Amino acid sequence: MKLELGNFYVEEIVFGEKTSFKDGVLTINKQEALDYVMEDENITHAELHIVKPGDMVRLCPVKEAIEPRIKLDGRTYFPGVTDEELTRCGEGRTHALKGCSVLVVGKHWGGFQDGLIDMGGEGAKYTYYSTLKNIVLVGDTNEDFEKNEQQKKNKALRWAGHKLAEYIGKTVKDMEPQEVETYELEPVTQRSEEVTKLPGVVFVMQPQSQMEELGYNDMVYGWDMNRMVPTYMHPNEVLDGAIISGSFMPCSSKWSTYDFQNFPALKRLYAEHGKTVNFLGVIMSNLNVALQQKQRSALFVAQMAKSLGAQGAIVAEEGYGNPDADFIACIVALENEGIKTVGLTNECTGRDGFSQPLVTLDEKANAIVSCGNVSELVELPPMPVVLGELEALARDGLSGGWAGDEILGSSVKADGSVIMENNAMFCGDQVVGWSTKTMKEF
C-alpha cells in the first residue's frame, strides 16, 4: 500500500473574501465556513477565531483537534464519519495543510474528556497545540440531554470539526505541494533479504474504547472500537483518516485525530524500516473494561505478533487507570512469546509523585517510557482572552479541574488564574511520540 502525502506549509491564517491558499497564506471566508458548519441542525451557535503561537489566549473546554486534509480522488477523508461510504484509507494522494489545526471548543459546556490550551505564556509549554496556528471553532449545540453530564459524547461539535477540516483542506486539492512524503511498506512476505534479516517490529496501539455505551470511544472507519477485537492494520490507514479520536479519556492522555494523522512513533518506525528494523505493521488493539475482554485482547495481540515473526514490539496506550491492566497484559503476553517489548504511557503517581505509577505492574514490563504524571499540579496566571468558558474547568468535571477543594479552593480563581492537574491539559502527555517532558532523579 502506497500513500503520498502532499504538504502545504501554512505561514499565516487570515479571514478574507475567498477561502484559498496562496504563498503560505491560508485565507478563510468566515461566513461561508460558518454557514457550512451550521448546516447541522444540532449546532445552535458557532464562531470562528484564529490563534497563533505566542498569543495570550486561553482555550477551554477544548474537545478535538484535526489537521485539514483532502483526498485528491474525491473520496471522503474520514470514511464512515464525514460520509457513510466506506473506502480504504492509506493509499493514493492526500494533500495536507501543515503547521495548523482545527480546534473544537465548547462555547459553554465542558466535561471529563475536555481540556485546556494556553497559546502563550507559562502554560504554552504543556501542550503541542500551542506551537500550531489554529482555526478555532467555538460552538454550542442542542444536545441538552448531556449538558449537565460529566461525560459527554460531544458528537455534533466533533463531527463539525472533522467536516470543517475537510472543507478547509479543499483549498489545496488542485495545487502542487511544497513537498511529497511517501509511505509504503511491502507485503510482509515479499520483502528483500536485506530487510527480512533485520529485527521484525510491530507497533501495538491501544486507543480508548472503555465505554460500553456507543458514541464515546475512538472510531475506526466509523466503527466504535469497543466493538472490535485486535486487528492487523497498515500504518498508512492510521496516518490517513481511518481513525478519529473519541470523547472519553482524561484529556492529557487523549490522542486527538490530529495525533492519529501525524503519529510520530509510526513515522519514526517508517524512517527506521530497512535500516535498523523490519517494520511489520500495526496491531490495533483496544482498552475494554471487563477482565475477560482484556485477556482476549492480549491473546490476540501476542498471537498476531508471533505469527508475523516479530522479535520486538512497542505498546502504546491512550489512557491510564483501568487501561493499565490491558497495557501490562499485552506487554507480558508479548514477552512470554519471546518478543522484546517497550511500553509508552503516562503515569498517575499522585500530586506528590510517590504513588504506584500504574494500576498494575509486572516484572516483565521492564522497559516503559513515561510521558508524564497526570496528577502533577499546574498553576497558570490569568489570560487576557479566553475562547470558550473557563468556568467549565471547575464546574463541569473536567478530569483535571474541580469546583472546590478544602485547601486549594476552586480550580478557577476570581482573577482568572488557574490551578489544575496536568490531567486537564489538552493532549498534554503526547504518548504518540512528541512529548518534550523529561524525568529527573533526586
UniProtKB/Swiss-Prot annotation:
Disulfide bonds: none annotated. InterPro entries: Gly/sarc/bet_Rdtase_B_asu/bsu (IPR016585), Gly_reductase_pB_sua/b (IPR015417). GO terms for molecular function: betaine reductase activity. Pfam families: Gly_reductase. It catalyses: acetyl phosphate + trimethylamine + [thioredoxin]-disulfide + H2O = glycine betaine + [thioredoxin]-dithiol + phosphate + H(+). It comes from the Bacteria. Keywords: Oxidoreductase. The keyword Oxidoreductase applies. Its EC number is 1.21.4.4. Heterotetramer of two alpha and two beta subunits. Component of the betaine reductase complex, together with components A and C. PB is substrate specific. In the first step of betaine reductase, the substrate is bound to component PB via a Schiff base intermediate. Then the PB-activated substrate is nucleophilically attacked by the selenol anion of component PA to transform it to a carboxymethylated selenoether and the respective amine. By action of component PC, acetyl phosphate is formed, leaving component PA in its oxidized state. Finally component PA becomes reduced by the thioredoxin system to start a new catalytic cycle of reductive deamination. This is Betaine reductase complex component B subunit alpha.
